[in-house]
């Protein structure tokens, strides 16, 4: 049954077991006006993990020579501040076969992965995992510093990889598996995926919309 924005129902398995569920319609997140940006904020100070928190007891992230380094698969890492709309600059480097990701508001993953010279897919470098496909493969490959410049306004996202726009003002339909939560209308942190293996990040700068930090 649908009541306003909430859907309630029952699923019956082939074995006859019944399971009730409740779902809430995803918000449209339409903005009435173009964003007014606040001053840029450096999220990583190059010295320690101030402003960040590991998800889980075992934290393998370290600040090494100005680089936020994930030395092995383990805990994910999130900012302690939460954001609504923003522009994000972040530089990253992965080893051969590396796999990580940058979750926007902790819910929408921009994939970081070594995909070689393959044709782009939504789970390849720069894609919005599971949803949006980059229009071109402009990866520099493993063991080389690369850059993302990402703009997120409501559900609309633009991703530039190494200075080339590969996703241009497209709508993100939903959340990525592994998201922190499904509360899409709420502010959320920047979330760096660390559970797959080694990866490094540096020069992480966010420009939030005015009054868009919690």
Task: Locate predicted features.
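Carbohydrate-interacting regions of secretory-pathway proteins
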Residues: 1-214
């Amino acid at each position: 049954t649908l009541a306003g924005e909430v859907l309630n129902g029952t699923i019956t398995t082939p074995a006859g077991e019944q399971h009730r569920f409740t779902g809430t319609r995803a918000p449209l997140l339409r903005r009435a006006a173009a964003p007014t940006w606040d001053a840029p904020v450096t999220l990583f100070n190059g010295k320690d993990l101030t402003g960040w928190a590991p998800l889980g007891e075992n934290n393998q992230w370290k600040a090494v020579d100005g680089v936020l380094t994930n030395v092995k698969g383990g805990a994910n890492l999130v900012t302690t501040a939460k954001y609504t709309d923003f522009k994000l600059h972040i530089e990253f480097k992965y080893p051969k076969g590396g796999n990580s990701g940058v979750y926007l508001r902790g819910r929408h993953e921009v994939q970081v992965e070594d995909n070689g010279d393959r044709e782009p897919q939504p789970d390849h470098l720069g894609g919005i995992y599971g949803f949006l496909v980059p229009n071109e493969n402009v990866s520099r490959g493993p063991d080389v510093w690369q850059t993302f410049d990402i703009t997120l306004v409501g559900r609309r996202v633009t991703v530039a990889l190494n200075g080339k726009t590969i996703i241009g003002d497209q709508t993100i339909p939903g959340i990525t598996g592994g998201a922190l939560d499904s509360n899409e209308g709420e502010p959320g942190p920047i979330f760096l995926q660390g559970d797959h293996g080694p990866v490094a990040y540096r020069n992480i700068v966010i420009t939030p919309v005015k009054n868009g930090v919690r």
